[in-house]
Regions:
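Methionine residue identity
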Residues: 1-3, 16
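Short, Lys/Arg-enriched N-terminal segments with co-localized hydrophobic residues
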Residues: 11-29
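Short amphipathic alpha-helical surface micro-motifs
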Residues: 27, 38, 57-59
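N-terminal, charge-rich interaction modules
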Residues: 29-46
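Feature captures the catalytic cores and cofactor-binding loops of soluble hydro-lyases/lyases
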Residues: 51-52, 56, 60-75, 79-143
Length: 143
């Protein structure tokens, strides 16, 4: 079905290269392990979850924004380190939380993530840079 759709689009917009159109309609997934490597991040919890796929990303420091605007989302990028982050991620079925700017959650947060089977990564990159790197690898926003 997807193949037919991009062929239909390429016929309608003949000035666009069909490979570009096909790329636009590709679904890109990335494993948590691939994100870790791309971001030069470290696992704080969830190495056993490293092969889970993620397709969409949302970034915010206000969990009210995450709850209000995060549509389909697999990964949450934040600099906020409090238990509400893990609780919010659980409510939205997020598989991975990435803490930016070198922020590290405390042991209580990691225990909560462990109980909810949510992978936790930390990177020294700023939030904007983290989002840009994942965007370059094909992931898109989940809002």
């Amino acid at each position: 079905m997807q193949m037919l759709y991009w062929q239909y689009i390429s016929q309608r917009f003949c000035c666009m290269d069909q490979y570009i159109i096909y790329y636009l309609f590709q679904e890109v997934f990335m494993t948590i392990r691939e994100m870790k490597e791309a971001l030069d991040a470290k696992f704080l919890y969830g190495e056993e979850l490293a092969d889970l796929d993620a397709q969409f990303v949302f970034s915010a420091d206000m969990m009210s924004d995450v709850l209000a605007y995060c549509g389909k989302c697999s990964v949450l990028i934040t600099g906020l380190c409090n238990p509400q982050v893990v609780r919010t991620a659980e409510m939205l079925d997020i598989v991975c939380i990435i803490f930016v700017r070198g922020k590290l959650p405390d042991e209580n947060m990691l225990a909560l993530a462990r109980g909810k089977s949510i992978a936790v990564l930390a990177t020294d990159h700023y939030m904007f840079t983290t989002c840009g790197i994942l965007y370059e690898h094909g992931l898109r926003g989940g809002a």
